[in-house]
UniProtKB/Swiss-Prot annotation:
UniProt organism field: Unknown prokaryotic organism
Alphabetical UniProt keywords: Antibiotic resistance, FAD, Flavoprotein, NADP, Nucleotide-binding, Oxidoreductase
Catalysed reactions, as listed in the record: a tetracycline + NADPH + O2 + H(+) = a (1S,10aS)-3-(CONH2)-1-(Me2N)-3,3a,4,6-(HO)4-2,5-dioxo-1H,10aH,11H,11aH-cyclopenta[b]anthracene + CO + NADP(+) + H2O; 7-chlorotetracycline + NADPH + O2 + H(+) = (1S,10S,10aS)-3-(CONH2)-9-Cl-1-(Me2N)-3,3a,4,10-(HO)4-10-Me-2,5-dioxo-1H,10aH,11H,11aH-cyclopenta[b]anthracen-6-olate + CO + NADP(+) + H2O
Protein name (database record): Flavin-dependent monooxygenase
Pfam families named in the record: FAD_binding_3
Any one GO molecular-function label of the UniProt entry: FAD binding
Regulation: Inhibited by anhydrotetracycline.
Protein role: An FAD-requiring monooxygenase active on tetracycline antibiotic and some of its derivatives, which leads to their inactivation. Expression in E.coli confers high resistance to tetracycline and oxytetracycline, does not confer resistance to minocycline or tigecycline. Degrades tetracycline and oxytetracycline; the reaction requires NADPH. Degrades and confers resistance to chlortetracycline.
Gene3D superfamilies, per the entry: D-Amino Acid Oxidase, subunit A, domain 2, FAD/NAD(P)-binding domain
Co-factor(s): FAD
Co-factor binding comment: Binds 1 FAD per subunit; it is seen bound in two conformations.
EC number annotated for this UniProt entry: 1.14.13.-
Length: 388
């Protein structure tokens, strides 16, 4: 029965290809669409942690992830004058333990897409209308084409257009945690060699790292602010806000910002959580950041995507395609795991971005040890069902 169930998956990030993989493996017929012209290269580094590591191994992609993992050998905290405060080895600096690995977002998506090479995927495509009834979901695409599907799974990120089309505003909350994050690539003008530098002061954080591409460096900014942008998606407003927020910050900040116009991969967003009582409505389900973003600072969004994809597809298999039963179980099984990770996301948002008088070697070490312990707990705070 399952092979005749046609499922549209919206979004080629991490959650979309992951759920498509498990749907195909469990006998369904998924198809993917993505509004971008191609898979976005590079991007921020993501962690494969805890139970998600087990899922990656089950998918047969863990060794590929290890082969393409980041290779930061040293992390170094500096003050606004450039003095070294604290130094840690790469894995400890990234809060990774045992067989956990870090990989660039673009590299992970590339691995996932190769794992589902036989699944139809259409780029430069998006949905402008969704209508559902007892028997199917009718989808209208931006090019005017109309298609019917048995189910739709939306994995189109924290600013999910699907969520806005299907769910009313009182069915979800975007919780602003009071901070912003930005990242972009610039030339490796400091000559960093598999190293990350981190400068934290006055509720602001600037990072600079260089890994496998010796001529390039990834700059990162995080900062607290009560200011609300008029248009969170306006890149010029974002860049102006970033400049204004880090004026006279010190260290290499101005040199980094001066090189920002050279970058072609500028990213900026508010540190936000998505809260929903139910991630499903009728024949439509949300997954990944579209459903339960825990906050970019938590580093757990990738793991929620892996676990959510496995459970959603697995419950559909277990229910032999009975989406009502499967969606109910998806919500029941995943909610405690999501809540634990979102609580951790709030804690990280509050514990990072310290005041001037709080930044020290002792504080940095104590915070790292606490984060390591908490990550290990929340990353493994679910017992995965067996569907095969």
């Amino acid at each position: 029965m399952t092979k005749h169930i046609k499922i549209l998956v919206i979004g080629v990030g991490v959650a979309g290809p992951a759920v498509a993989y498990w749907l195909k493996r469990f006998g369904f017929s998924p198809v993917l669409i993505e509004k971008s012209a191609a898979v976005r290269k590079g991007g921020q580094a993501l962690d494969i942690r805890g139970i998600a590591t087990h899922i990656a191994k089950e998918m047969g992609i863990y060794d590929q992830i290890c082969n393409m993992r980041t290779q930061i050998k040293c992390g170094r905290y500096v003050d606004v004058k450039g003095n070294v405060l604290h130094e840690e080895q790469g894995e400890t600096f990234g809060f990774r333990q045992d067989d956990e690995v870090e990989i660039l977002r673009g590299d992970l998506v590339e691995i996932l897409m190769k794992a589902i090479a036989d699944i139809p995927c259409e780029f430069k495509q998006s949905v402008i209308k969704i209508e559902q009834n007892e028997d199917s979901v009718t989808v209208t695409y931006k090019d005017g084409r109309v298609e019917n599907y048995d189910l739709v799974i939306a994995a189109d990120g924290i600013h999910s257009a699907t969520r806005g089309m299907v769910f009313s505003k009182n069915e979800y909350q975007l919780i602003n945690l009071g901070s912003y994050v930005s990242a972009f690539t610039i030339p490796n003008y400091l000559g960093l060699d598999h190293m990350e530098l981190l400068c934290e002061s006055n509720h602001k954080l600037v990072t600079l790292q260089s890994d496998s591409q010796a001529d390039k460096a990834m700059a990162g900014f995080m900062f607290r602010s009560k200011h609300v942008l008029e248009d969170i998606r306006d890149e010029q407003e974002q860049k102006h806000f970033l400049h204004a927020s880090f004026q006279n910050f010190g260290w290499e900040t101005q040199n980094i910002l001066n090189r920002m116009p050279e970058s072609d991969d500028f990213y900026f967003d508010a540190i936000t959580q998505i809260k929903m009582k139910s991630w499903t409505k009728g024949r439509i389900a949300l997954i990944g950041d579209a459903a339960y973003c825990p906050s970019p600072l938590s580093g757990q969004g990738n793991n929620l995507a892996f676990v959510g994809a496995y459970i959603l597809a697995g419950e559909l298999k277990k229910a032999d395609g009975d989406y009502i039963q499967a969606f109910t179980r998806y919500n029941e099984l995943l909610h405690p795991f999501v809540e634990a990770n979102q609580q951790f996301g709030v804690w990280v948002s509050e514990s990072f971005l310290l005041k001037d008088d709080e930044v020290s070697k002792e504080i940095a070490e104590a915070r790292s040890n606490k984060i390591l312990a908490m990550i290990k707990s929340v990353s493994n705070s679910i017992n995965l069902p067996q569907y095969e």
